[in-house]
Amino acid sequence: VNKLMIQMGIPMILSMALQAVYNIVDSAFVGNMRVGSEAALNALTLVFPVQMLMVAVGIGTGVGTNALLARMLGQGNHKKAAKVAGNSLFLGGIIYVVCLLFGIFGVKVYISSQTVDLKVISMGTSYLRICCIISMGIIFFSLFEKLLQATGRSLYSTIGQVVGAVVNIILDPIMIYGIGPVPEMGVQGAAYATVIGQVASAALLFV
């Protein structure tokens, strides 16, 4: 049991740690914004727990799928294994719909319950709304990651995470400060860079 907990727990911890890199990188860049950097940092601080909750739900669902899928494959029952994979993707779709609805209707209520600073509320709402509405990247990446691990291809999930993080690091200054033809978007730019990185990770694993 202890060995199983380690095998399943360590990848989950590493995944959450790597996903936290997105918020750390975003915070580093918005902290250097010419206007409103303090409010932006406060906004990201309020948003971070919700982001990690989405990551935890996605990874938790993936870990359960991983265990069941590995069991079916070990038994040579490929038909049930395919059904498990399909059900996990359907569940991922339900999780995304919940995040989408929260992004549309619940984000401002949540941020407003944490602060009375109107600038922080505006920035936090903008950032979190984008992350929730385009959360399919992080949700399905978490599921694809565990599906690959169950089939012994964990290296691909690591590559996907690294690619997503690199995409985020590259896009952050471009979209936050406005470089070349890209307009300055501030906190919204940080959010878009994050979700693009997450979608890139998920797309890479899907391919």
Spans of model-derived segments:
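Alpha-helical transmembrane segments of multi-pass membrane transporters/permeases
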Residues: K79, G92, L147-I174, Q188-V195
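Residue-level signal for short hydrophobic patches within transmembrane helices
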Residues: N2-V21, V25, V50-V57, I133, ...
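Small-residue-rich hydrophobic transmembrane alpha-helices
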Residues: L41-L101, I138-S157
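Helix-loop interface residues and adjacent transmembrane-helix termini in multi-pass membrane transporters
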Residues: V21-I24, N32-M33, E38, M72-Q75, ...
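Interfacial/gating helices of multi-pass transporter permease domains
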Residues: V30-M52, K119-M123, V187-G189
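Short alpha-helical transmembrane segments in multi-pass integral membrane proteins
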Residues: V1-G9, L69-M136, V182-V207
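Transmembrane alpha-helix boundary and packing residues in multipass membrane permease domains
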Residues: M12, M16, A28, A67, ...
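Interfacial helix-loop-helix junctions of multi-pass membrane proteins
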Residues: V30, I174-G189
